[in-house]
């Protein structure tokens, strides 16, 4: 009997503004749909200025069969500091939370504890800062926020904004490790692995990829990254 698998993806939408400088949320949704993922973690899903309305409208996402998890704030935002999460039917929310992050500009992370084919899975969506020092502080703040929660398999997903191999980040996340995914930035000629997954104990990646098909190369300055995950043991939390 085949072990259950789950496909998760991360995508920096660049506020649904493509390299052609056109804001086209329908095009962004076309890219998201092509990932064939059950969970999609988004960055820059809202516009920049307060009250930060959604760049990817709720109703458009829901019309495509997505459930938008409740991270939005008053004013119509899809997410928290631009971080949002979409799930397909069959994935249900058990608990969620916001995580404030330190830095030169307002940033935050989101947490969702989800019932999935793998059992209970904790997914943290993040978009770390451009300055290395603050990236490390932000990741440390995320790990502190998770420390007192009941244990379950954990995935950190998002734009880590780190052009290197992530060794310093891995020292902060302790028992987690970065899955070996391909470069995703910049979209026309990707050379940097900014968009990644960090997996906790009990999880492994069976396959991964970067969506290269059009319109992904023009819909954002990032390409979306996906990973197929499975449990390393028969136990599920």
Task: Please state what every model-predicted region is.
Residues 1-39, 51, 67-237:
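Active-site regions of metal-assisted phosphoester/phosphodiester hydrolases
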Residues 57-64:
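Glycosyltransferases and closely related glycan-assembly transferases
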